[in-house]
């Protein structure tokens, strides 16, 4: 696929400032966010990382977030992952459509986890619709092991908040989730993803 040229950096060193952040031994920020690491119960060592992430979520400009996301351009999972976390933590709902589109496109690995978190953090009926659109497209694809478990966990979280039942039809016996999860010997546990989303949204 041919992509248009990347968007220019609106500031000097946006990726270094928000995506990399720390050198060894702490390691780059995106590794702390990968697989929801900062939201796991045993992640007490991540407190400074979370504090810095909160500060940066308020500090980063919309222009810098668009630069990190590079919508419609060559994707980078690291910068997209971090951008989506910053968007979700600061509840920047004006990025809702962009995040939903990137999730549905699923152009690159790992960043879908953060899109699901951001939509869960927004927690509105519109976000539930975007997650169901993703699940309707990708749960029938038993050959694709994308972020279906993250999307379903995020949808369960929104159901808990809104008192809705969007996730129920996927979790029915012999339903779409059971068939997708049963296609591999070690399927992901959707309840674990839901609990992780709960922890992440409480940050």
Regions found by a protein language model. Name each.
Residues 1-82, 136, 141, 148, ...:
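Extended repeat-based scaffolds of very large eukaryotic assembly and lipid-transport proteins
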Residues 47-56, 81-90, 112-124, 145-157:
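Structural detector for internal amphipathic alpha-helices that build alpha-solenoid repeat scaffolds
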Residues 58-70, 92-104, 124-137, 160-171, ...:
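Amphipathic alpha-helical scaffolding segments comprising HEAT/armadillo-like alpha-solenoid repeats
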Residues 73, 77, 93, 109, ...:
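Alpha-solenoid helical-repeat scaffolds
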Residues 73-108:
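Extracellular-facing segments of soluble proteins and assemblies that are Gly/Ser/Thr-biased and enriched
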Residues 107-116, 139-151, 163, 178-184:
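Boundary/linker segments of alpha-helical solenoid repeat arrays
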